[in-house]
Every structure is written in structure tokens, then in C-alpha cells.
Amino acid sequence: MSGCGGSCNCGSSCSCGKGGGCNMYPDLEKSTTLTIIEGVAPMNNKGMVEGSIEKATEGGNGCKCGSSCKCDPCNCCSASTIWT
């Protein structure tokens, strides 16, 4: 059974279908915080932790409102997504 029925919709919270797939962790989808602890990770010449911010964020499974009120990306709503 898919967590969101294979359908995306973009409502007031840009949620995903019936099962709440994209809205399952709303605190992670609505804000992202990057914490740098100096002395633990190698620093580059700009004072940033080496690597990209994308690696430090949730992982790209959240829905964002795109054009025509559709969730973009909507990979959380794939038919292969199974919530146990």
C-alpha cells in the first residue's frame, strides 16, 4: 500500500495524497538547519564544511509547490513507496 496513494496534490501545506506521505515529517519539510561544529570536520578556505549543503539536508524526498500547484519533486508519492 502506498503511503500517499500514488497521487500528489498541492494544498495549503503542499501535502501529498491521502496517506500524508510528503507531510509525514512536516518539521523537516518546512525548515532546514545546517550546524557547523568547528574542529570536528575539515574546513575549506571559505570557512564551510567540505561537501555540499544537499548532503546535510533531508535527502530530497520532500514536496515543494511547483508550477500549476503540483508538488515538485514528488518522489515521495511513487507507487513503490511502502509505509509500514
From Swiss-Prot:
Belongs to the metallothionein superfamily. Type 15 family. It comes from Solanum lycopersicum. This is Metallothionein-like protein type 2. Metallothioneins have a high content of cysteine residues that bind various heavy metals. InterPro entries: Metalthion_15p. It holds the Pfam family Metallothio_2. Keywords: Metal-binding, Metal-thiolate cluster. The keyword Metal-binding applies. One of its GO terms (molecular function) is metal ion binding. The keyword Metal-binding applies.
